[in-house]
């Protein structure tokens, strides 16, 4: 039974590799963060909103970064849908990109700044 659960977890992790995972519940958020922490993976979070124009501009760039850095976990959180998570990390402007590793916030990028986001993903993914 434990082997099946481990296989299911490994399969789920592999499915998300190279893709942006949209988080729609606190339970899903907790599961994604716990799995990434256990695997000591970099987590890059895009705090976004459906009404945010710059967020829509950054979405394909964020998706490309997820493909280029499949060892990291890329999460997308709608601040209106999951307000408690946005508040927990003091997100006040969109887009805000947060970099976490083993439960600690390592860095952030506030705004639609492609060059800074790309540079910081490369920097933190290498650590």
From Swiss-Prot:
Q: List the disulfide bonds.
A: 52-55
Active site (UniProt)? 52 (nucleophile), 55 (nucleophile)
Task: Report the sequence similarity comment from the record.
Answer: Belongs to the thioredoxin family. Plant H-type subfamily.
Q: Which CDD domains match?
A: TRX_family
What this chain does, per the record?
Participates in various redox reactions through the reversible oxidation of the active center dithiol to a disulfide. The H form is known to activate a number of cytosolic enzymes.
UniProt site (Deprotonates C-terminal active site Cys): 46
Q: Which keywords appear in this protein's UniProt record, sorted alphabetically?
A: Cytoplasm, Disulfide bond, Electron transport, Redox-active center, Transport
Q: Which Pfam families match?
A: Thioredoxin
Descriptive protein name: Thioredoxin H-type
Q: Which residues form the Thioredoxin domain?
A: 2-127
Where does the UniProt annotation locate this protein? Cytoplasm
Site described as Contributes to redox potential value, located at: 53-54
Please indicate if the UniProt record lists Transport as a keyword: yes
Sorted alphabetically, the Gene Ontology cellular component annotations on this record are:
cytoplasm
């Amino acid at each position: 039974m434990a082997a099946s659960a481990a296989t299911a977890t490994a399969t789920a992790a592999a499915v998300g590799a190279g893709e942006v995972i949209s988080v729609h519940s606190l339970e899903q958020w907790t599961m994604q963060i716990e799995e990434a922490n256990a695997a000591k993976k970099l987590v890059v979070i895009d705090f976004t909103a459906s009404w945010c124009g710059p967020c829509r501009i950054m979405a394909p760039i964020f998706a490309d970064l997820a493909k280029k850095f499949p060892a990291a976990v890329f999460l997308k959180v709608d601040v209106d849908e999951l307000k408690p998570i946005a508040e927990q990390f003091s997100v006040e402007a969109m887009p805000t990109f947060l970099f976490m590793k083993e439960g600690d916030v390592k860095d952030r990028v506030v705004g639609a700044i492609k060059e800074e986001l790309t540079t910081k993903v490369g920097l933190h993914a290498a650590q």
